[in-house]
C-alpha cells in the first residue's frame, strides 16, 4: 500500500527550481531564507534590498484579509495573525503559525502551534502534514476556530490548508485548491509545494485502489 511515508521518501528535491524568500518578523527584522549547496541558509538582512535578486517587491501595506475556508478554518497572513481586532472579529481560538522567524503575538489569548517551514520548493511540505492536521483537528474537536498563517498567507499556509482538505474530505487537489483560492484569491503555493500536493493526491488514489482490491478479494 502506498503510504504518506512512502510519498515523503520518494519525493525528490533535485528537479525543483531554487529561490529565496524574505520574512518580516514581529519586531521588523528581515530574514532571508535561501537554498544553496544542498543546505538551507537563513540570514538576517541588514540593508534594504534594491530588488531583483529574488524577484521580491516589498509591500508595506497590511494584509488583513482572512479567507474563510470553513466556519472553523481560516487562512491568512502574519498581518492578520498580529491584529487582535481581526482575530476577535473572526472568533479565532487557535493559531497555526507555519512561518519561519515570525513570533506569536498574543500568547495569553490564543492556543498556538508554531512549526517553522521554509518557503522553498525544496522544502518537503508533506513531512509537516501530520502535526499540522492534528492541530487543526484538535481545534475543530473543541468547537474552536483555527487560523493557519505563514508570512504572506500565500504559499506555506495555503499548501497546508489544501493538503488538509484533501486528507479530511477525501477531495481532489483541484477541488481543494479551488476552494481555498475562492476564499483567499492571493494564494500561490510555490512550484515545489504544488508538485508535492499532486503527488499527495496520487498516493491517496493509489491507497483507495488498494482498499477496493482488498475488499473485493
UniProtKB/Swiss-Prot annotation:
PANTHER family: DUAL SPECIFICITY PROTEIN PHOSPHATASE 19
Function: Has a dual specificity toward Ser/Thr and Tyr-containing proteins.
Entry keywords, A to Z: Acetylation, Hydrolase, Protein phosphatase
Domain Tyrosine-protein phosphatase: 65-206
Organism: Homo sapiens
Cellular component per GO, a single term: cytoplasm
Entry's Gene Ontology BP terms: negative regulation of JNK cascade; positive regulation of JNK cascade; positive regulation of MAPK cascade; regulation of JNK cascade
Broad class of enzyme this protein falls into: hydrolase
N-acetylmethionine: modified positions: 1
Active site: 150 (phosphocysteine intermediate)
Catalytic reaction list: O-phospho-L-tyrosyl-[protein] + H2O = L-tyrosyl-[protein] + phosphate; O-phospho-L-seryl-[protein] + H2O = L-seryl-[protein] + phosphate; O-phospho-L-threonyl-[protein] + H2O = L-threonyl-[protein] + phosphate
Description of how activity is regulated: Phosphatase activity is enhanced by Ca(2+) and Mn(2+).
EC number, UniProt record: 3.1.3.16, 3.1.3.48
Family annotation (Gene3D superfamilies): Protein tyrosine phosphatase superfamily
Family: Belongs to the protein-tyrosine phosphatase family. Non-receptor class dual specificity subfamily.
Organs and tissues of expression: Expressed in the heart, lung, liver, and pancreas. The expression level in the pancreas is the highest.
Tree of life domain: Eukaryota
Single GO MF descriptor: protein kinase inhibitor activity
Name the record gives this protein: Dual specificity protein phosphatase 19
